[in-house]
């Protein structure tokens, strides 16, 4: 199978690139994720896909949310501008008749990062901390997708039963504590609320209040990793996403892990493919599926 067109639909951006047979990304570009509903998302996808219809052999899509039966649904619709249900496969097929494979973005990233590890680990997990919190799981060298595409939605495991209400409708999910959205929300009580990116900039400059907010996020991730270690006997965790890859975040997660008994700790490292794990993983997965 020749070149593929990979797309990564996230809460803030949609990235696209041609992926060669050797796994090289060519012509990568991205746009902001539309916030205006299904019509705008469909138009954005056509803008990104149409120029490549006669240049590639297949289309591979990694997307935030639940991918099942060709549809994209969201546990937390706020992560997609309120979009709760979208006929993703049919939309893409209306743009191009090329073979198309869909996968959750955390699952796709996990597959790419698992390949990058080589044949070293049977059980690993990818964690993305970004607009939301998600992930993908490899068990016994196989990607766990699930009957309904739900596997890896670790951001909706419990962090604080008395915490804020998550966009999924449950109270105290990890996502509602640790995500970039949650970090930004923590500043609403400040004299001047700021974005998650600004919180990280402030922490880098030694701002104690900003550091405390980031530490709370990192601690929630560390506790979630402890739970996943005990449930899945993980050998390694790969950290990605805009927050997960922010300067100093990995070190804060590791520091939070060190407060736990040794059995609950798991090695954590940054994503080898950085922000492109989802793009590459979708293409790699498509090659095994088509």
Swiss-Prot record:
GO biological process: N-acetylneuraminate catabolic process
Organism name: Yersinia pestis (strain Pestoides F)
Gene: nanK
Transmembrane segments: none
Keywords linked to the UniProt accession: ATP-binding, Carbohydrate metabolism, Kinase, Metal-binding, Nucleotide-binding, Transferase, Zinc
E.C. numbers: 2.7.1.60
Entries under HAMAP family matching the protein: ManNAc_kinase
CDD domains registered for this protein in UniProt: ASKHA_NBD_ROK_EcNanK-like
Pfam families: ROK (PF00480)
Protein name: N-acetylmannosamine kinase
Upper taxonomic lineage: Bacteria, Pseudomonadati, Pseudomonadota, Gammaproteobacteria, Enterobacterales
Metal-binding among keywords: yes
């Amino acid at each position: 199978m020749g070149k593929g067109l990979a797309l990564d639909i996230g809460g803030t951006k949609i990235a696209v690139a041609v992926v060669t047979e050797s796994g090289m990304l060519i012509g990568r570009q991205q746009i902001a994720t539309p916030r205006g509903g299904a019509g705008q998302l469909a138009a954005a996808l056509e803008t990104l896909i149409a120029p490549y219809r006669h240049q590639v052999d297949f289309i591979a899509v990694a997307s935030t949310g639940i991918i099942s039966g060709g549809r994209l649904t969201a546990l937390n619709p706020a992560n997609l501008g309120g979009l709760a249900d979208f006929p993703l496969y049919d939309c893409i097929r209306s743009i191009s008749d090329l073979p198309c494979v869909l996968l959750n973005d955390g699952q796709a990233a996990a597959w790419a990062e698992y390949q990058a590890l080589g044949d070293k680990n049977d059980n690993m997990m990818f964690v993305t901390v970004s607009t939301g919190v998600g992930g993908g799981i490899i068990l016994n060298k196989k990607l766990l997708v699930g009957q309904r595409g739900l596997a890896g939605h670790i951001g909706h495991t419990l962090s604080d039963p008395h915490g804020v209400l998550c966009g999924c409708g449950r109270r105290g999910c990890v996502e509602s504590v640790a995500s970039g959205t949650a970090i930004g929300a923590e500043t609403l009580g400040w004299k001047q609320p700021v974005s998650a990116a600004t919180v990280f900039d402030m922490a880098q400059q030694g701002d104690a209040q900003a550091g405390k907010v980031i530490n709370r996020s990192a601690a929630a991730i560390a506790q979630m990793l402890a739970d996943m270690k005990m449930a899945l006997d993980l050998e390694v965790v790969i950290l990605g996403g805009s927050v997960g890859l922010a300067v100093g975040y990995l070190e804060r997660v590791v520091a939070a892990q060190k407060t736990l008994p040794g059995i609950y700790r798991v090695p954590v490292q940054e994503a080898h493919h950085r922000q492109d794990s989802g793009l590459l993983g979708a293409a790699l997965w498509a090659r095994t599926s088509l």
